[in-house]
Amino acid sequence: MAKNDKLGALGGFRLAIILVGALTLSNCAGKPGDGTNDPFETVNREIFDINMSLDKAILRPITQAYVDVVPDPIRDMVNNLLFHLKEPVTLASDILQGEWDRAGQTTARIVGNTVIGFGMWDVMGSSGAEGHKEDLGQALAVWGVPEGPYLVLPILGPSNIRDGAAELAQSLYDPVDFVTDTYLDYDTNFYVSGSRTVFTAIDKRAQVLGKLAELEKTSLDFYATIRSLYRQKRADEIRNGESGDAVPIPEITLELDEPMLSEPIAQTSKK
């Protein structure tokens, strides 16, 4: 108990530092004149090229094999489970934004899909309680925190200062990680979190497997296209709007889980 209390206090301090830092940097950034909000474009493009090279060399072939080998019903179950595991974050964001109707619906989904669907079948969605995604970045936007400059993060892809800080805070305070951290030993928890991270990346990549290649083929400036689509997508999500026929944003995303963040750098920096 003492250990958990100590970690909780340290985690709270880290969360405060992250969010205050994001707010400060976002406010100091100012508004760009060209509307792209990309003052770090030169560095961003270099990171983008590296990310795409990693995608083509590693993530895309793995995802293609996953799609080719794993039957659709199994992939649907994996997708449902990963979505289900993120719904506690959605619930917290719903509450932080004062969206009580959506919070109630998310609560019903968590309970119903856990008890009846075992997390792998969206029985509540079939009953009319459709799922939605919310995150801390959206809550900060509703609170008036500006997005700050556009960023391309190594491995993680398109982001900005506000959303990047929010994603880091979420990784430190993911409710599912809290449960596994409490009931599993460190090694088991690390492998469970790692598996979740890997399958999340593969599942997200599978959603845009053909679309990303087509988008790259038809874009005069692939980097600028992704930047524009990302910013449109985030603005739409903050408004709780529908994306309509917009092309989904290709993601090369590895969600950071706390056990992975706490692993010594010497052990995690090498691929």
Predicted regions and their residues:
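A structured, mid-to-C-terminal "fold-capping" secondary-structure block
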Residues: 138, 144-271
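Beta-rich strand-turn-strand
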Residues: 79-81
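Bacterial N-terminal signal peptides that target proteins for export
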Residues: 2-16
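Bacterial signal peptide processing site
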Residues: 29-33
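Mid-length scaffold segments of soluble, non-membrane domains
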Residues: 84-162
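Post-signal peptide N-terminal segment of mature Sec-exported envelope proteins
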Residues: 35-61, 65, 83
